[in-house]
Design a protein with these regions (language model features):
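Conserved SAM-binding strand-loop segment of SAM-dependent methyltransferases
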Residues: 160-171
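Class I SAM-dependent transferase core
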Residues: 48-52, 62-108
């Protein structure tokens, strides 16, 4: 029934007043359902029974293994594969990349000399930024993409950065043998499913974790 209604609406065959009424009622029913404690528990239990992430191979094929040259054409100079920060004085994408990473540093209280894990590092914008800014830090960059890790290795070699350590890992079989002072993960958690197992793994590796 709903699919037939959508079919009619997409073809402009449903009066706007009726469409608005349906959307309002449907939204209210979903909100009521979402507030149910049983529903919340069911969702959490379902997430906790699954893997940390699903379809990681498909995700790679869809966009993570797209050649770096493509992203160089559409992203900023640091290939920041996540949100940037435009304030009133920021006029370019390159500046917005830096502004956002400065905010990460402030909020995570990152300092020189720390050991840092960048989980889901993308094309290495933050990892490389940290390695350049803090020469006494050791930055471990983890991605599921061979192309991304290869790109980071190439940039690190060009800039003679010895304190950055990129490696390919699937988050479902994450192997972390070091302790980290900071674990940063930028816009990766929306791709995760079993948050509990992931956070348990990360808390084990960090002696003083921060939110």
């Amino acid at each position: 029934m709903i699919s037939f209604g959508i079919y009619l609406a997409e073809r402009g065959l449903v009066p706007e007043s009726l469409l608005r009424l349906f959307i309002k009622q449907f939204s209210l029913s979903r909100l009521t359902e979402a507030k149910s404690e049983d529903k919340k528990k069911s969702v959490i239990d379902g997430l906790n029974r699954g893997p940390i992430a699903e379809n990681t191979i498909d995700a790679n094929e869809q966009h993570y293994e797209v050649p770096a040259d493509y992203f160089k054409a559409v992203l900023g100079p640091r290939l920041k594969y996540s949100c940037c920060l435009f304030d009133e004085e920021t006029t370019t994408l390159g500046e917005a990349e830096i502004e956002m990473m400065e905010l990460y540093l402030e909020r995570a209280q990152i300092e020189d000399g720390q050991t840092i894990l960048d989980l889901g590092c993308g094309w290495g914008s933050l990892s490389l930024f940290l390695a350049e800014r803090f020469p006494n830090c050791n930055v471990y960059s983890v991605s599921n993409s061979k192309d991304q890790i290869e790109h980071i290795e190439n940039i690190a070699k060009e800039k003679n950065l010895k304190n950055i350590h990129p490696e390919v890992q699937d988050v479902n079989s994450l192997s972390l043998e070091k302790e980290f002072d900071r674990v940063v993960s930028i816009e990766m958690f929306e791709h995760m499913r079993n948050y509990k197992d992931l956070l348990d793994c990360l808390l084990y590796t960090s002696p003083s974790p921060r939110d």
